[in-house]
């Protein structure tokens, strides 16, 4: 099966999922990659600490600077070929929004030593840096597995 439409999901869509979106998107240029939250702060920009960590790692900030949090919808779930979530509890949250999406929902950290990627919201910069590395490692693995 081809996974051409990838949706990355966290809680609020202001920290982890937008960062993962902007890490994975350039590695899979032929795929549609987007992000959303199960309890999104709709319209809220990316957390300033996320932008700071992205800047320090020389990521393209164009998408993060204009990011507006999106609420996960049943339609988004049906559109996606693969839904990558940050924590095991998000698998159930996705299924509650769209039961048909359960079979295509996996943990972003599935292939890493630590499957759950903790929420960095309202945490210090050192925690953001740790979470960044977990997300970057997971995205690198997924990019290799999904490369066509």
Model-derived regions: residue spans:
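Short polar/charged helix/loop
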Residues: 1-148
């Amino acid at each position: 099966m081809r996974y051409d439409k990838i949706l990355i999901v966290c809680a609020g869509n202001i920290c982890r999922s937008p960062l993962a979106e902007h890490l994975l998107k350039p590695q899979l240029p032929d795929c549609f990659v987007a992000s959303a939250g199960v309890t999104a702060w709709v319209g809220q920009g990316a957390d300033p600490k996320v932008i700071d960590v992205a800047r320090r790692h020389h990521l393209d900030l164009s998408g993060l600077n204009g990011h507006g949090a999106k609420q996960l919808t049943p339609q988004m779930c049906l559109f996606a070929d693969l839904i990558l979530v940050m924590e095991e509890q998000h698998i159930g949250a996705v299924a509650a929004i769209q039961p048909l999406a359960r079979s295509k929902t996996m943990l972003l950290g599935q292939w890493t030593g630590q499957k759950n990627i903790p929420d960095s919201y309202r945490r210090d910069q050192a925690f953001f840096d740790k979470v960044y590395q977990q997300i970057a490692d997971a995205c690198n693995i997924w990019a290799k597995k999904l490369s066509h």
